[in-house]
Amino acid sequence: MMRALLLAIGLGLVAALQAQEFPAVGQPLQDLLGRWYLKAMTSDPEIPGKKPESVTPLILKALEGGDLEAQITFLIDGQCQDVTLVLKKTNQPFTFTAYDGKRVVYILPSKVKDHYILYCEGELDGQEVRMAKLVGRDPENNPEALEEFKEVARAKGLNPDIVRPQQSETCSPGGN
């Protein structure tokens, strides 16, 4: 059950959505690489298990052929859980698959500079799950980006219970 929770959370961190708008094909993938901070998250249905107590920055790296690697660490139930996920490039810009094609990952820009709304759809333990995450280049909360995230979540019929995990540069069981 914990593995399924970690897989679901990890996948949700590397997907994005914004009112069905895709970035221009020419927008460089380079813009996505580097350090991102998870600012908010939600899913439908709600993923069973505990929500992360804190998260480290998400690191996106380029792999050969246009694939991406995402790395992040969560503190869940007092335990540090490292997640590394490979996103396989598709024929659509800023659209990837994960877990042998079982999940589709969209990476789309927010209207707010240096923010993305991450979105994914796919199967988890035999059930269809949709997740959205708000990430930004700095750890500070941005009310405009959060409001846009809430609007997108509402429009997609996601759980209105928005989780805002604590930011942490490193994972420390028993403290942040």
From Swiss-Prot:
Chief location category: secreted
Gene Ontology molecular function terms on file: small molecule binding
GO biological process, alphabetically ordered: sensory perception of taste
Domain of life: Eukaryota
Assigned GO CC terms: extracellular space
Cystines in this chain: C80-C171
Signal sequence segment: 1-19
Subcellular location(s) of the protein: Secreted
Pfam families named among the record's database cross-references: Lipocalin
Keywords: Disulfide bond, Secreted, Sensory transduction, Signal, Taste, Transport
Similarity field: Belongs to the calycin superfamily. Lipocalin family.
Assembly: Predominantly monomer. May form homodimer. Interacts with LMBR1L; this interaction mediates the endocytosis of LCN1.
Protein task: Could play a role in taste reception. Could be necessary for the concentration and delivery of sapid molecules in the gustatory system. Can bind various ligands, with chemical structures ranging from lipids and retinoids to the macrocyclic antibiotic rifampicin and even to microbial siderophores. Exhibits an extremely wide ligand pocket.
PANTHER family linked: LIPOCALIN, LIPOCALIN 1-LIKE PROTEIN 1-RELATED
Protein name: Lipocalin-1
Organism: Sus scrofa (Pig)
Gene: LCN1
